[in-house]
Amino acid sequence: MVESSDIASRIWLIAGPTASGKSAYALDLAERIDGEIVNADSMQIYAGLRVLTAGPSQEETARAPHHLFQIVDPALGWSVGRWLEAATQALAEIQARGKPAIVVGGTGLYFRALTHGLADVPPVPETQREISSLLYAARGETEFREILKPLDPEAEARIESGDRQRLVRAHAVAITTGKSLTAWQTDTKPALAPGSWKGLVLDPPRAELYARCDARLAVMVEQGALDEVRALETRGLDPALPALKAVGYREFAAHLRGETSLDQALDAARQETRRYAKRQLTWFRNQTPDWERIVP
């Protein structure tokens, strides 16, 4: 539990899987310490998806200042680098006001960028990305990992099974620059100074977390998630856009096209939400072992 006496110069980083209660925890903390909240969820960045991404309501934003929520049009992309720039600016402004800052979300790469920095890796030519991707497709993950291992052994060991995108990127960076992605990252300074922040991970029991995931989807439908998906579908946006990869979007869009019943869409969305929560749990367990664990 966070003690009020421990807030003087700290930035609070509150992470956790979807439906773990981290947003409510952050809001409660913000009210207790008169703090301001900064979004660290890659989907809550996008406008028009507040319900589907469980973004803060008007009532919640009235209780404490919120930053970087629903600020990007879904037709646009958004990178870790752009978030880091916006987040560090927001944190500086909050601290200039003499307020504690609370960064909350479920996107592990955002937190890693804050605490470890974001490597200034030179651009990788599209041709090399394609070559690395084709090599992965031709050889399969197991053999591709053996190819990557001498180039970047740390990345090969760190990247989870099935994460094709990160494996391919590590290979392409090493081939293009002659320097491993891990080396680029190691040479990078963190955005937050050591000792200036405190990390917390909300870690509810697995069965309880899954039950929360299931219950929240039904509430989202009641609160207008289908209307949000319908509004974006009418825009004819590219399905590859990051915003349209929000958990539940694909399943509800299929229902709106008449391809599935609402019950089928909900069942599929529940399964995808559980898988997403499991991936998040694994990431935070592996990448933030020293952060304090909170059972909500």
Swiss-Prot record:
One of the record's GO molecular function terms: ATP binding
Catalysed reactions, semicolon-separated: adenosine(37) in tRNA + dimethylallyl diphosphate = N(6)-dimethylallyladenosine(37) in tRNA + diphosphate
Enzyme class: transferase
Site feature: Interaction with substrate tRNA: 107, 129
Binding site for ATP: 16-23
SUPFAM superfamilies named in the record: P-loop containing nucleoside triphosphate hydrolases
Keyword vocabulary terms for this entry: ATP-binding, Magnesium, Nucleotide-binding, Transferase, tRNA processing
GO terms, biological process: tRNA modification
Cofactor(s) named in the record: Mg(2+)
Region (Interaction with substrate tRNA), start-end ranges: 41-44, 165-169
Binding site for substrate: 18-23
Keyword Phosphoprotein: no
InterPro entries referenced in this protein's UniProt entry, alphabetically: Dimethylallyltransferase, IPT, P-loop_NTPase
E.C. numbers: 2.5.1.75
NCBIfam families given in the database record: miaA (TIGR00174)
Described purpose of this protein according to its UniProt entry: Catalyzes the transfer of a dimethylallyl group onto the adenine at position 37 in tRNAs that read codons beginning with uridine, leading to the formation of N6-(dimethylallyl)adenosine (i(6)A).
Family: Belongs to the IPP transferase family.
Assembly description: Monomer.
Protein's name according to its UniProt entry: tRNA dimethylallyltransferase
Annotated source species: Caulobacter vibrioides (strain NA1000 / CB15N)
Lineage: Bacteria, Pseudomonadati, Pseudomonadota, Alphaproteobacteria, Caulobacterales
Gene symbol of the encoding locus: miaA
